Amino acid sequence: MKEMVGGCCVCSDERGWAENPLVYCDGHACSVAVHQACYGIVQVPTGPWFCRKCESQERAARVRCELCPHKDGALKRTDNGGWAHVVCALYIPEVQFANVLTMEPIVLQYVPHDRFNKTCYICEEQGRESKAASGACMTCNRHGCRQAFHVTCAQMAGLLCEEEVLEVDNVKYCGYCKYHFSKMKTSRHSSGGGGGGAGGGGGSMGGGGSGFISGRRSRSASPSTQQEKHPTHHERGQKKSRKDKERLKQKHKKRPESPPSILTPPVVPTADKVSSSASSSSHHEASTQETSESSRESKGKKSSSHSLSHKGKKLSSGKGVSSFTSASSSSSSSSSSSGGPFQPAVSSLQSSPDFSAFPKLEQPEEDKYSKPTAPAPSAPPSPSAPEPPKADLFEQKVVFSGFGPIMRFSTTTSSSGRARAPSPGDYKSPHVTGSGASAGTHKRMPALSATPVPADETPETGLKEKKHKASKRSRHGPGRPKGSRNKEGTGGPAAPSLPSAQLAGFTATAASPFSGGSLVSSGLGGLSSRTFGPSGSLPSLSLESPLLGAGIYTSNKDPISHSGGMLRAVCSTPLSSSLLGPPGTSALPRLSRSPFTSTLPSSSASISTTQVFSLAGSTFSLPSTHIFGTPMGAVNPLLSQAESSHTEPDLEDCSFRCRGTSPQESLSSMSPISSLPALFDQTASAPCGGGQLDPAAPGTTNMEQLLEKQGDGEAGVNIVEMLKALHALQKENQRLQEQILSLTAKKERLQILNVQLSVPFPALPAALPAANGPVPGPYGLPPQAGSSDSLSTSKSPPGKSSLGLDNSLSTSSEDPHSGCPSRSSSSLSFHSTPPPLPLLQQSPATLPLALPGAPAPLPPQPQNGLGRAPGAAGLGAMPMAEGLLGGLAGSGGLPLNGLLGGLNGAAAPNPASLSQAGGAPTLQLPGCLNSLTEQQRHLLQQQEQQLQQLQQLLASPQLTPEHQTVVYQMIQQIQQKRELQRLQMAGGSQLPMASLLAGSSTPLLSAGTPGLLPTASAPPLLPAGALVAPSLGNNTSLMAAAAAAAAVAAAGGPPVLTAQTNPFLSLSGAEGSGGGPKGGTADKGASANQEKG
């Protein structure tokens, strides 16, 4: 190793630690010195070590940073094959590390083009105008300042800093223009004691509990307080990759969410980057935590201090980051005490998004995962208990809100204690629930104390990561694993080892779902804070912190944020639509469920939800907290409200229905987990689609009202309302389930009936007599039973079954009754079968129809025995009618027979054929006939039989002159149809077959009705049937049957279905209803869709 000359090229810290040594490149004429964590060195070699530039052996002239004009320094490969400084990647928010652990390659694809268009004012001041426009510039982290400069230029000018947002976990990588940097220095000096103390405390806490990162630990061990920034730098090296990513992501989010963006962006980017190296989360977490710390220091200053300064100044602390942190702390604590932490915590708010993010992660790490698991459950049972912890959490949060460097430690320890006292009142609700346990909060704090730096830093990093990642994920896709980001956010499994693991596991789960999940939650927090402005941001971030701290990990928070977000149009919508909607939606629901499951048990849903909603500004955090804590129940109701509004629309959404239904069922049980899934489902649904969100609008409105009420301290009422909404949602779910069951049962019954009806009935020889009288029929059903009744019954089912019944009744592909062209053979056949019985029962008029329709011999019989059975049964009284019906059924296909038979009472046997034809009439006809040619053959045979039967009828003395006329016309029509059928048969297609069948049946029908009405038009036929029935009396039944047959033929595209459908109409018409034209054959298909009359 070379002798140590100068500091780290990344963090500028000259110190090295055993856990995070300063490594020097052994390349020729290379002066690169970096901390292991700052450069992403997984393992420092015992022999010579070479930086990536020297390792690549590329000519120095070809190695230049794509983000700045400088060629020297610690460079790494970029995703596009170029090179970039690690420090440039850390300080430019949109730059990410594909692998946070190794901090390479550097991902530049998300850097907006306008960054490359900015010019460096430092280069211009120093006379390097030619280089001023090269690379990508960062902007002064001071809110409102538009000065742009290269990262390396600012580094050389000493304008970069790492602001520790949450003492331990995260570091904000901040850079300021000279003017604002000097102001930041003065403000830091003024609040330096508090900030430094807090930072130092945080550092030592991080060191103690920070098995996380040697750098961190050593930093905390080493004069982290006195040299917070240096250890920060050192850790920043490690955390930087993470922080860098977090910062980038945070900045990325920063843009969307402006208030938290300032604070959160650094954190998120860091977390993002940490997340990027999720795989090496542990090491990176160590390094990231250090980096986080330093990054937080620097970025916190940059983002936190900058944004906080901006906001903090706006709020109350215009001082430097330190003072800001202090101000934030005091503001938070005072806010907490005052009960307006959200509003008074504007300054804390600014830091809050950042810090909030920290607490968020930190809490989940230390408290939430260690404690919330246990405390959370207790929290759910006792909302008030969780509330005090919430206050603590919030205090933490507030403290976290305060700048990490200043407030970080104090926040965790003294600040949190101080803020806690006031916090409980103000944030109590949100935080307690969020924490899910006062112990959790406190413990978290202590845990932070023990390993606060890692935990706090980690949470912040995680949060930043989350926020940035969420935004990035939502924008760019799933991105890095949430879990790793969370882990890293956790600051590595080291400090919050257990919490970290839990958080990692939990958060991993949550994170994954978060795809914007944790990000979303943090992002939401950020968004909400930005959206809501200083007061909004603070609460939002605070809530965020509590969310994580609340033992709700991001995942929960995210869903809630969704819910809440939906409620909160700005916060939730942006997040849910951009983050959750795209990548996180599905993941969120899925993972969220598991998180919910695990979180719900630990915490009560009601409080969480309530608190979530209570905090209008902090919808996200609170929801998360609540969700994880007791509030789950409350959230559920809230969600259920949203869900109930969504329920019907959402049910249409498969994913929602599947998720929502079972979760809703669970909700029925009122299990917190169930509630959570429901909440998640709704949340997911809402983010997923605008439609879902719209459905949730009513719920959202209520939820928003609930949030407002909760914000006003009416959490209890909100809980009740949410529970009511949940209850209503559960009831709706039960009702729908019952409906499904009933429909299923009906379907089964119809199927059974169909099978029964498929069995051919004995043919009734006395067709005419039967026609004259009610059809004692094969079914022996009373003629009074109306086919319309059967239709209505089949139609009565609201579900598709009813449709199927209608279809089956109408046998034709287009259900005359339903007017629906649905063609479900099984459904049709089933349903058609039951209707036929009622039809048979319907009346003698029906029989007459059947009789005229059944004149065809039993050609249908060959077709499943339905044709002949329908002929015999349907025509029961009238063999000729049977033949006709059989002919129709045969020609139309079994469906016709079945329907006609069923309708006429002669169709008793037909149902079987119907069922066969029931499917798509087209398919079924072939099924019944076994082939188009076979069907055609049957049609021809049936037509011949029908002609014979009609001739017999004409010869029969029973026929009156009117009947004879009708029969004669029918014979003519049958002959005409034969020609049409032959032509159609030539087509050989099933549909043509159906139309042929329809055609064949039509001639019969038209033959029956021609005397009264033109056979050509189905409507005339039906009216004719009606007229015929009255005029013929008993004979009318024959005429009616003929008319019905004609109507049927006219009605259905596939004759079989058509015939069946029409028979109902015809039957009613014969009885005097004058079914009106149902439709025509396939040829007369238009009429099929006409009114039933």
UniProtKB/Swiss-Prot annotation:
The keyword Lyase does not apply. It comes from the Eukaryota. GO terms for biological process: chromatin organization; negative regulation of urine volume; positive regulation of sodium ion transport; positive regulation of transcription by RNA polymerase II; regulation of DNA-templated transcription; regulation of transcription by RNA polymerase II; renal potassium excretion; renal sodium excretion. GO terms for cellular component: nucleus. Residues 317-340, 410-425, 787-796, 818-832, 839-853 have a biased composition (Low complexity). The record marks G551 as: KMT2A/MLL1 fusion point (in acute myeloid leukemia patient). Residues 345-354, 804-813 have a biased composition (Polar residues). A zinc finger (PHD-type) spans 5-57, 118-181. The modification Phosphoserine is found at S258, S378, S423. InterPro entries: AF10/AF17_PHD (IPR049781), EPHD (IPR034732), Histone_Mod_Regulator (IPR050701), Zinc_finger_PHD-type_CS (IPR019786), Znf_FYVE_PHD (IPR011011), Znf_PHD (IPR001965), Znf_PHD-finger (IPR019787), Znf_RING/FYVE/PHD (IPR013083). The modification Phosphothreonine is found at T451. Residues 191-212 have a biased composition (Gly residues). A zinc finger (C2HC pre-PHD-type) spans 62-95. It holds the Pfam family zf-HC5HC2H_2. Residues 185-500, 775-871, 1060-1093 are annotated as: Disordered. The keyword Zinc applies. It is found in: Nucleus. PANTHER family: PHD FINGER PROTEINS, PROTEIN AF-17. It is linked to A chromosomal aberration involving MLLT6 is associated with acute leukemias. Translocation t(11;17)(q23;q21) with KMT2A/MLL1. The result is a rogue activator protein. This is Protein AF-17. The gene is MLLT6.
